[in-house]
Amino acid sequence: MKQFWLIKSEPNVWSIDQQKKSGVKGAVWDGVRNYQARNNLTKMKIGDLCFFYHSNIGKEIVGVVEVIKSAFLDKTDKEGRFVAVQVRFIEKFNNPISLEKIKKTKAISHLPLVKQSRLSVMPIDYKSWKIICKMGKIKEI
């Protein structure tokens, strides 16, 4: 069964546009150094979908990516404790959804994005996924 996630990146480090340029091969999502986020990465399966969130600058959901390779050891982690996944670009939102708008939308204000602001990889329930897709003016993927 497909699962839904949100992953964060600082756009000056890795943006949705850079993700798009990575093409069908996608890009490795690495560098995550939080144990709860790591645990979420290990639960990701091929075909799962993730909202792509620009953190720090913008603070908004800007698109959707798909997991194309499930968790493997993160080569940037010298200790071997953390994992990475590989994701490919699916769609960029015409209307990015700001954190402020998410906080003000009662139906999705419960999300970890609001409650655990430092968490960089988090699950998204299907009902919230549908609402956010509608808000971003994309068809439900």
Predicted ranges, named:
Residues 1-44, 139-141:
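Compositionally biased, charged N-terminal/linker segments
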Residues 12-14, 94, 131:
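Short, acidic Gly/Pro/Ser/Thr-rich loop/turn segments
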Residues 14-17, 59-61, 75:
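Short acidic/glycine-rich loop or secondary-structure boundary segments that cap or lie
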Residues 18, 96-102, 133-135:
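Short, charged, solvent-exposed linker or helix-capping segments at domain edges/interfaces
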Residues 47-48:
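Loop/turn positions that initiate beta-strands
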Residues 53-59:
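Short, charged beta-turn/beta-strand-edge "cap" motif at the junction between a beta-strand
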Residues 62-122:
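Aromatic- and Lys/Arg-enriched surface recognition patch
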Residues 124-141:
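Charged phosphate-binding loop/patch that engages nucleotide di/tri-phosphates or the phosphate backbone
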